[in-house]
Design a protein with these regions (language model features):
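Basic- and aromatic-enriched surface patches that contact anionic nucleotides/nucleic acids
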Residues: 2-35, 39-198
């Protein structure tokens, strides 16, 4: 049995997790990452830094039989066969699959363990102004896109729809590997959006 160390782009991994080509073996624990850890992982991706290795086991070996299950947040047609089982990198790949694809909603928890549904955005002007400000530019908001204060009575920031995202200059990260160009072309001045994606 040999080992291979192929290099794949993140977009390929996202495509494979969403299609079910990569699934989890039944012995893997559940998804447990906290909101801030996910936000920091997204900062790492945007900076283009390495984020660790992923270890996959090719399926089809008659001597190794594990029951596969979908990456959390991915809904597969029953009977979808996995080509690979994810042995290492589950928390990172699950976080990235949920945050960077589909509706972008990540089922996570806060530092006190409370369950949350979050979405992630990047303020394009801040991210483009200085590469050292990417950490500051990436924000986590409730799944509805609305940040509230005063026990939910006051709206601090509303990113609940595309018009409001454009108005405030926040790009939804779930479009980063998807239909980003449609979103960018709807901006009054699409040049910064195109520069951001490059």
């Amino acid at each position: 049995m040999g080992f291979l160390t192929p290099m794949h782009e993140l977009g390929e991994y996202l495509k494979w997790t969403r299609s079910g080509e990569i699934q989890l073996p039944d012995f893997q624990r559940g998804y447990k990452w906290e909101d801030e850890r996910i936000r920091q992982l997204l900062v790492t991706v945007l900076r283009g830094h390495p984020m660790g290795a992923v270890m996959l086991l090719k399926t089809g070996n008659s001597q190794v039989r594990f029951k596969p299950r979908a990456i959390e947040g991915v809904h597969l047609t029953p009977g979808t066969e996995a080509k690979y089982l994810l042995l290492d990198g589950q928390q990172r790949l699950t976080s990235l699959t949920q945050a960077l694809s589909g509706n972008g909603v990540v089922a996570t928890k806060d530092s006190r363990g409370r369950l949350l549904d979050r979405r992630y955005f990047v303020h394009m002007e801040t991210a483009l102004s200085d590469s050292n400000r990417v950490d500051e530019a990436v924000i986590s908001v409730p799944a509805d896109g609305v940040v509230r204060s005063n026990f939910g009575k006051d709206v601090v920031l509303d990113l609940g729809d595309q018009d409001k995202q454009h108005e405030h200059g926040y790009f939804p990260l779930n479009l980063l590997y998807g239909d980003f160009m449609s979103w960018i072309l709807e901006l009054q001045n699409p040049a910064p959006g195109k520069h951001f994606h490059d």
